[in-house]
């Protein structure tokens, strides 16, 4: 039975819980203190990617990925409440699909809203099934917080764009078959107006992906060099020179996704406190409650934003609030894990200490990736509170005339 054959919530919930119990491992029983995101070896990262891809396909085949996507685009044509029920029943199960979930959350709404019929029918089925891996190609060495200053150029040659430039901090790019790529197509326009959004083939000549190995050994970030690679005009998402709108939508979805992917850290922190015999200490209990409650609030906010995006409506909560909230949560979680373990928390001796070490590593990158805290505070001040904008010396100037470092 598939999701589109069920109209009763109780029946759907029963089918979902039964399928999960028969097909997916419980995190608590099979993978306590699981380390999914910050693995210190390429071998583990590669295996994690393969496992996530298989899990994405398994969820898709069972009707639990692409639940609300129309059937003509490879989805299951279900209702939004079905996604909610699945999330509720899947709590505690190992259904995380790593960066597949992340890139789908960012890319799918943009394709559904801005894509042509051909683009949607071509790309959405393989995106939501995990058959094709995607990555985001936005940030550049000289355009991170000021993304609209990007310099990767695309020049039209007949019906193809010829592209030259560099992207950086591209998660999972080493595995990607396709990418969502921002390029400069009109240097004579103001910097926000000459950008085009492309659906880009990563497996072609002229594309070089280099892993960025971090201090603790992980290499899931990459830098991408593009030297003469091509992209057909049929792969423009939206309009030429009008890519900033779809790009902003992707970034809003990214903020909501980061909040929705908050995981089960509070539950694991509680388990760790119990195992260490510290769960009854007043200060520890106070910190556990704070982390647990903030995590619940974060998921509620993220779901409200995601529900609005799925309906094509403006988000009721500014996505920057969610991004700042999750960054603060990560710091609280990392501090609490180290508080529980003490000096043992900086030496990996077992699964619990390895997990705590990863929380420690994750405390500050989340304040940078997906837009720095400072950028998101500016967004809130200007867009939500109506405060005066920062002084910009490049306002009203063509991109080509803006001084560059």
Regions found by a protein language model. Give the residues of each.
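Amphipathic, small/basic residue-rich leader segments at the start of a protein or domain
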Residues: 1-101, 122-126, 284-285, 289, ...
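Glycine-rich beta->alpha junctions and the first turn(s) of the following alpha-helix
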Residues: 3-5, 11, 207-301, 308, ...
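Alpha-helix capping/hinge segments and adjacent helical runs
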Residues: 22, 26, 60, 64, ...
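Internal helix-loop-helix
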Residues: 53-130, 172-178, 258, 295, ...
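A short, Trp-centered hydrophobic/proline-enriched beta-strand micro-motif
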Residues: 130-138, 182
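A structural signal for short hydrophobic beta-strand segments in well-ordered beta-sheet cores
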Residues: 152-155
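A short core secondary-structure module
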Residues: 159-160, 164-210
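Short, charged, amphipathic alpha-helical segments
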Residues: 285-289, 317-324
């Amino acid at each position: 039975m598939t999701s589109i054959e069920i109209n009763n919530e109780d029946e759907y919930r029963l089918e979902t819980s039964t399928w999960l119990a028969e097909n997916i491992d419980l995190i608590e029983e099979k993978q306590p203190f699981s380390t999914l995101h910050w693995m210190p070896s390429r071998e583990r990262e590669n295996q994690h990617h393969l496992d996530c891809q298989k899990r994405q396909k398994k969820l898709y085949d069972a009707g639990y990925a692409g639940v609300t996507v129309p059937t003509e685009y490879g989805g299951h044509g279900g209702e939004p409440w079905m996604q909610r029920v699945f999330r509720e029943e899947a709590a505690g199960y190992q259904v995380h699909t790593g960066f597949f979930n992340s890139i789908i959350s960012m890319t799918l709404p943009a394709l559904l809203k801005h894509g042509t019929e051909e683009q949607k029918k071509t790309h959405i089925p393989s995106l939501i099934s995990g058959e094709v891996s995607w990555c985001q190609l936005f940030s550049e060495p000289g355009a991170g917080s000021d993304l609209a200053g990007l310099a990767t150029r695309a020049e039209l040659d007949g019906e193809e764009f010829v592209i030259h430039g560099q992207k950086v901090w591209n998660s999972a790019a080493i595995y990607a078959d396709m990418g969502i790529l921002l390029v400069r197509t009109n240097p004579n326009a103001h910097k926000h107006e000459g950008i085009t959004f492309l659906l880009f083939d990563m497996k072609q000549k002229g594309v070089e992906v280099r892993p960025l190995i971090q201090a603790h050994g992980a290499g899931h970030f990459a830098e991408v060099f593009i030297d003469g690679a091509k992209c057909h005009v049929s792969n423009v998402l939206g309009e030429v020179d009008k890519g900033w709108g779809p790009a902003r939508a992707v970034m809003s979805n990214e903020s909501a996704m980061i909040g929705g992917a908050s995981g089960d850290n509070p539950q694991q922190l509680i388990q760790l406190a119990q195992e260490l015999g510290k769960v009854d200490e007043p200060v520890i209990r106070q910190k556990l409650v704070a982390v647990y409650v903030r995590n619940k609030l974060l998921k509620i906010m993220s779901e409200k934003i995601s529900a609005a995006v799925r309906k094509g409506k403006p988000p009721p909560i500014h996505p920057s609030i969610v991004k700042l909230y999750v960054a603060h949560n990560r710091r609280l979680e990392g501090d609490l894990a180290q508080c529980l373990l003490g000096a043992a928390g900086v030496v990996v001796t077992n699964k619990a200490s390895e997990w705590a070490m990863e929380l420690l590593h994750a405390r500050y990158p989340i304040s940078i990736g997906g837009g720095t805290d400072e950028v998101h505070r500016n967004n809130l001040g200007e867009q939500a509170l109506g405060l005066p904008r920062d002084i910009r010396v490049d306002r009203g100037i063509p991109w080509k005339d803006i001084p560059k470092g």
